[in-house]
């Protein structure tokens, strides 16, 4: 797998140029930066990103070890030990239950530091987050007893921003009501709701937007400048010619209609290549496209290179 850090940084600059200067941009680098390598990517993005987001505390630790000193928001829930480590790392933990607050308070008090948290509001995802005004007010009551915990942010997540504007608007209205309640209680957190699918809509930008899949080149066709940054590369390990009527792979799902030159690549679904791409995908070899034939195996796949007569073992295949 080849990853272009330069392409990812340029994607971040493109996204940054599309939002107002007053709106912060948080770059989501969870799941090892969507498989692109968070420890290498985050430092390269530090000049563009105002903040970073991860899913779990282990990912926050990796960023700190890579030299990231900016805001790191842990978007997911956490057990007690993870919450305490977030305090030690200076990372901002998503909070939606009083018990989490107390764990942050206890650890921060012990270390004589101020813990940071982002209040998560469930506006319709039904995943994690405080749900309803009564629960929110109860959490705020608990927060008053936690002087060592700063409410750095408040956030929610839209679940159908791509194709259901009515429900997204309803979610945003619930979020704005939650912000109103929180600010009336004396807090001034950074508000953020929009991920990639909504980050260019001024109504949903609030104080900060979260660039996730768009950062990696996907999910935003309205910004054609965004480019994918991963290239999957392999090399053939075998060439063989089969006759008309011969079949290829498990299930015999491909039958040769002509004398066919078959190239075998040492990559399969065990390496993350989707099994469903058998008889559907194409590869690029010597500048020409060639179809994947037969079912994708666990660690191999086959390609019809009959129309690429100069293809050979040792070639680079994309």
Predicted feature residues:
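Mobile, glycine- and charge-enriched loop segments
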Residues: 13-16, 21-23
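Active-site-proximal beta-alpha core segment in soluble small-molecule metabolic enzymes
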Residues: 2-3, 7-10, 23-190, 205
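Active-site anion/phosphate-binding pocket segments in diverse small-molecule metabolic enzymes
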Residues: 1-9, 17, 32, 56-59, ...
């Amino acid at each position: 797998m080849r990853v272009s850090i330069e392409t990812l940084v340029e994607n971040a600059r493109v996204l940054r140029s599309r939002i107002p200067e007053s709106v912060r941009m948080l770059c989501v680098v969870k799941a090892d930066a969507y498989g692109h390598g968070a420890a290498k990517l985050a430092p390269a993005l530090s000049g563009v990103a105002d903040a970073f987001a991860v899913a779990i505390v282990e990912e926050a630790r990796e960023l700190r070890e890579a030299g990231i000193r900016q805001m790191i928001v842990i978007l997911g829930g956490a057990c007690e030990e993870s919450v305490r480590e977030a305090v030690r790392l200076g990372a901002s933990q998503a909070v939606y239950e009083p018990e989490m607050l107390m764990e942050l308070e206890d650890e921060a008090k012990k270390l004589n530091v101020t813990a940071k948290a982002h209040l998560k509001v469930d506006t319709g995802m039904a995943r994690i987050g405080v749900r309803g005004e009564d629960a929110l007010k109860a959490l705020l009551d608990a927060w008053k007893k936690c002087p060592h915990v700063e409410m750095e942010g408040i956030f929610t997540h839209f679940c159908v921003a791509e194709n259901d504007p009515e429900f997204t608007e309803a979610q945003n209205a619930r979020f704005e009501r939650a912000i109103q309640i929180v600010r009336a209680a004396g807090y001034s957190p950074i508000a953020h709701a929009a991920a990639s699918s909504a980050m260019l809509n001024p109504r949903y930008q609030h104080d900060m937007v979260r660039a996730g899949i768009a950062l990696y080149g996907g999910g935003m066709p309205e910004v054609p400048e965004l480019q994918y940054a991963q290239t999957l590369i392999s090399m053939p390990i075998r060439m063989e010619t089969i006759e008309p009527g011969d079949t290829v792979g498990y299930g015999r799902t491909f039958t040769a209609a002509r004398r066919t030159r078959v190239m075998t690549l040492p990559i399969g679904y065990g390496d993350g290549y989707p099994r469903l791409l058998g008889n559907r995908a194409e590869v690029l070899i010597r500048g020409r496209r060639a179809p994947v034939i037969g079912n994708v195996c666990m660690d191999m796949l086959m390609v019809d290179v009959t129309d690429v007569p100069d293809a050979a073992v040792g070639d680079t295949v994309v």
